[in-house]
């Protein structure tokens, strides 16, 4: 059920990050290199999750692995226990909660019309559902974390805090962000561009679907304009 995936990606996955934030308050500070293996493991896990996204053919699985990769960045920056790192983790968790839930919602609207989640079989919607393509574009751009979205603010704070703590981490961090952009654009092009399948009767988008997307993306845009609300 898509509702379960939306709640899982938007709320339950972020509760794990919140639990780590609370737990780190009782652990020693990271002035030593004691937590370096855990940070490298979290960043390497994010890179591997991103690489897994690149070879996915199932739309829902791709979005799920995307959520895992973003949580790897969150865990890495929480461990170093800096004010910028915690602010970036909070910003990215909230922003990606909206973004991943919106992507799952869009995946469900596509599945309702094509009855498949295979990427290559869901192409060609930009010709017949241009408004849905616009929602896909906005959600993917936010997943890539372009400025001035809250996703960009969170990743900028995370990058700055990790680089200041250990400059070598920028290699894994930069690789993760590069692969994120690659699979997000691949997902957009695979589901929206290309020829429309022949003999396919596609229902137009409904008002409830547009309302769902507005309720996902409008709060994220408003938070992006006033980030003081959460950081």
UniProtKB/Swiss-Prot annotation:
InterPro entries linked: NADH_UbQ_OxRdtase, ND/Mrp_TM
GO molecular function annotations of the record: NADH dehydrogenase (ubiquinone) activity; ubiquinone binding
Biological process terms in GO annotation: ATP synthesis coupled electron transport; electron transport coupled proton transport
Transmembrane segments: 1-21, 34-54, 63-85, 89-111, 128-148, 169-189
Places the protein is found: Mitochondrion membrane
The keyword Transmembrane belongs to this UniProt entry's keyword annotation: yes
The name this protein goes by in its record: NADH-ubiquinone oxidoreductase chain 4
Protein species of origin: Bothrops bilineatus (Green jararaca)
